[in-house]
Amino acid sequence: MHMLGEPRTMQIDPVYEDVVSDIAAFLEERLGVAVAAGIPEERICLDPGIGFGKTVEHNFELIRRLDELLALGRPLVIGFSRKSSLGKLLGDPEATTGSVAASVGAAVAAYERGATILRVHDVREHVEALTVAAAVAG
């Protein structure tokens, strides 16, 4: 999983030249290290670390440009469930969590852009929404 800095300081003004390109390069490098250490590539999933050392805008940019991370050829794990970025997007600058509805919306957006592994808290709500999204997609 990608994380800028360490947990105590990761949210203090995180800066990237290009958040998606920077994280793609990090994940590609870590994938190479894991494979070189003997882990079969087909057993590896990549996690861009939504909410870990990223601003609200960084998190949404990662979802918008998910195809650039999918180009690494591995399944992506997206964990946007209950993230403070969702609450902040919806107008609460002091949010420490996001609502279930916002979490489901973010999961559907990630799914529609190719995420195959979603880390969620409210499983039933996500399954229902993703079932509908899959039916619409055909």
Located regions from the model:
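Short acidic capping loops at alpha-helix termini that bridge into adjacent secondary structure
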Residues: 41-43
